[in-house]
Every structure is written in C-alpha cells, then in structure tokens.
Curated annotation (Swiss-Prot):
<keyword id="KW-0648">Protein biosynthesis</keyword>
<dbReference type="InterPro" id="IPR004373">
    <property type="entry name" value="RF-1"/>
</dbReference>
<feature type="modified residue" description="N5-methylglutamine">
    <location>
        <position position="235"/>
    </location>
</feature>
<dbReference type="Pfam" id="PF00472">
    <property type="entry name" value="RF-1"/>
</dbReference>
<dbReference type="InterPro" id="IPR045853">
    <property type="entry name" value="Pep_chain_release_fac_I_sf"/>
</dbReference>
<dbReference type="InterPro" id="IPR005139">
    <property type="entry name" value="PCRF"/>
</dbReference>
<dbReference type="Pfam" id="PF03462">
    <property type="entry name" value="PCRF"/>
</dbReference>
<keyword id="KW-0963">Cytoplasm</keyword>
<dbReference type="GO" id="GO:0016149">
    <property type="term" value="F:translation release factor activity, codon specific"/>
</dbReference>
<comment type="function">
    <text>Peptide chain release factor 1 directs the termination of translation in response to the peptide chain termination codons UAG and UAA.</text>
</comment>
<keyword id="KW-0488">Methylation</keyword>
<comment type="similarity">
    <text>Belongs to the prokaryotic/mitochondrial release factor family.</text>
</comment>
<dbReference type="InterPro" id="IPR050057">
    <property type="entry name" value="Prokaryotic/Mito_RF"/>
</dbReference>
<dbReference type="GO" id="GO:0005737">
    <property type="term" value="C:cytoplasm"/>
</dbReference>
<protein>
    <recommendedName>
        <fullName>Peptide chain release factor 1</fullName>
    </recommendedName>
</protein>
<dbReference type="InterPro" id="IPR000352">
    <property type="entry name" value="Pep_chain_release_fac_I"/>
</dbReference>
Length: 362
C-alpha cells in the first residue's frame, strides 16, 4: 500500500478512536445535536476503519510468516500461507479503495422513479405496468416506502406514464442506474398470430431535493394550472379543481398531479417532482461537461439510452451497458433485482477507480 494512502487511513483510524471516546463522554451525551453529529460521523467511518484494522492484522501475519521462510521444514507451508495472505490483502485494499471513492452526495437521498411507455403502443403501456410492479416489489424487499405521485392509465392495461416517490435510505444510490431504455421482447396478449413484438419503456430515477431547494424556485418561472381530477376519488372527482399542472417556463418541464383530493397537496407533490427534475438536469449537464473520457453508466432517462432487454421466450435479461446476461426473468420481474443492480454498481466503481490514479490518497 502506498505511503500516502497509509497516512490517510491512519488519520481516519485516529479520528474513529477519538469519536469513540467522545461518544462515551457525559458532556457530549447531554448535547443531543453534538451526539447525533458525532454518531453519524462514527457510522460513516466504521466500515473503512474495520477494513483498515483487518489489513493491519493481515500485514502483521505476513511479516510473521516471512520469518518462517528461514526454517527449511516450514518453508513450503509458509510460502503457501503467504500466497493466501497476499490475495487477502489485495482484496482488502480493493475494498478500501472503494470505500474511499468520492461519494455522490445524492446516493443516500429518497428518489422519484418515472416510467413512461415509448414505442410499442398498448404493449409498451402494459410493460410499464410490469416494470412498476417490479420496482414496487424490490422496494418492499428493501423496506422502502412507495407513494404514487401521478399516473395515466392505458385502456388495455398498464400505464402511459407513472411517477412514484420511493422513500428509504440509499434508494437513489441503488436505483439510479435504472435510468434509460428498457426493451421487452414477447408475444403480446393482443397478438392473435403469435408474433414476437418489441416495445420500449423509459425509466428515469432522480433524487428528491430538500425542501429548502424547493423554496428557492422563482414563482415567476412557474405556470400553475388547476383542473378537475379524472382519477379515483369518489364523490370529489370532477366536482373540484383539485388536480394541478405546473410548467417551468425556462426549461419547459411539466408535471401533473391529481392523486390527492386536496389541491394544496397535489401542488406540493408536483412542485417537488418538478424541482427534482430541474436539479437532475443541471447535475447531468455538469457531469457531461466535467466528464473525463470514459463511459458513463449512469443513464439520462432518455429514449436513446438502451439499458436492458427483457426476452420472455428465452427467460433472459440482458444489460447492454456491461454485457451482462442472466436467465431468471421471472425472478427479476418479481423484484429480485440485485442480480442486475449489484454488478452495474461494481462496474461503475471499477470505472471510477481506474480514473482516480492521481487522487490524493493513492
């Protein structure tokens, strides 16, 4: 391990032990704000500290084992042990590098997930319903809460478009690579001759912005229209102008919400989605401008992004970005998405690592 990284880790280790001591101090315990702040920092450092301690223990074992090489009787055993320890150390060093990667500040945020049917007509809308159920089930596995913000039903089933708010720590970080085009290849229920059709849905995942960011929006940039709800709502449907449509004039972004009976609640929801979209667009443009010449696995949520193909006849799911193929379509649609999500996150981390050769701790 390079000396600069060792210094960085030693510094973090000292800070970890310092906080550990402070958290048992009565003065700190009595100060709730300080205690909470230190607890959060302690939690952030715990994984990197654990890996560093493991690395130091492993390094100590290497030094001890090298001494055994001088013993002719133990030489072969010691050599095998050194090979095992060397592999273990390299694995720990890789884990440490990943833990020291620059964090996306939005990764721990809640997110909005939007699904829009694209090419394929009714079949695309039906598949958007399949994707919606897939993400809802995955959210349930993660113990995240979901709340539908807006949806437009399709006559043959599914949705023309649907927006869901997903609340749970790390939901954006886990789902952000879902943004892009999702293509389905199957025989539609409406197909009488058994021909396979290809349809596409577009998924966009954006972080929910804090309330203070929403308050900064210039009201003069917004056009707010109210109209009568056309969705569920019992006797209140079509009797009051509770539905809200907000247009951000400079960007042309439009968000509708008619899920709530209250116009005020619909407006708050629509505004939250709108501002999150605007901020996400700004982040994308910044990322595009500052990007080093490397592939960007994080999609834009545009039709041009081709993420996955779901082939029903072959029970196959293909992630085109990393050439990953799995034959468990039923399980994937049942919400068991980690088989696709974890590899793309690992690939992204590997890409970032390969471009961090000049970072301060390497």
């Amino acid at each position: 391990m390079k000396s600069s990284m060792m210094k960085k880790l030693e510094s973090l280790h000292r800070r970890y032990e310092e906080i550990e001591s402070m958290l048992s101090d009565r003065t700190v315990i009595s100060n709730q704000e300080k205690f909470r702040e230190l607890s959060q920092e302690y939690l952030k450092l715990s994984d990197i500290n654990y890996c560093f301690v493991q690395w130091k223990n492993c390094n100590h074992d290497v030094i001890e084992t090298k001494l055994l090489l001088l013993d002719s009787e133990l030489h072969d055993v010691a050599e095998q042990e050194l090979q095992m320890l060397s592999k273990k150390m390299k694995k720990i060093e890789t884990e440490i590098q990943v833990l020291l990667l620059p964090c996306d500040p939005n990764d721990q945020q809640n997110c909005f997930l939007e699904i829009r049917s694209a090419s394929g007509g009714d079949e695309a809308a039906i598949f958007s319903g399949d994707l919606f159920r897939m993400y809802i089930k995955y959210s349930e596995f993660q113990n995240w809460k979901t709340n539908i913000i807006h949806m437009t039903h399709s006559l043959k089933g599914g949705y023309k478009d649907i927006i869901v708010k997903i609340t749970g720590k790390g939901s954006y970080g886990k789902l952000k690579f879902e943004s892009g085009g999702h293509r389905v290849q199957r025989v539609p229920k409406t197909e009488s001759q058994g021909r396979v059709h290809t349809s596409t849905c577009i998924v966009a995942v954006i972080p929910v912005v804090p309330k203070k960011e929403i308050e900064k929006v210039n009201i003069n940039d917004l056009k707010i229209d109210t109209f009568r709800s056309s969705g569920a709502g019992g006797q209140h449907v079509n009797t009051t102008d509770s539905a809200v449509r907000i247009t951000h004039i400079p960007s042309g972004q439009v968000v509708e919400c008619q899920d709530e009976r209250s116009q005020h609640k619909n407006k708050a929801k629509a505004l939250s989605v709108l501002v999150s979209r605007i901020k996400a667009a700004e982040l994308y443009n910044q990322r595009k401008k500052n990007a080093i010449q490397r592939r960007d696995l994080l999609g834009t949520g545009m039709r041009s992004d081709r993420n996955r193909t779901y082939n029903f006849a072959q029970n196959r799911v293909t992630d085109h970005r990393i050439n990953l193929v799995v034959y468990c379509l039923d399980e994937v649609l049942d919400g068991k998405l980690d088989v696709l999500i974890e590899p793309i996150i690992q690939e992204h981390n590997a890409d970032v690592l390969s471009n961090l050769s000049n970072i301060e701790f390497l």
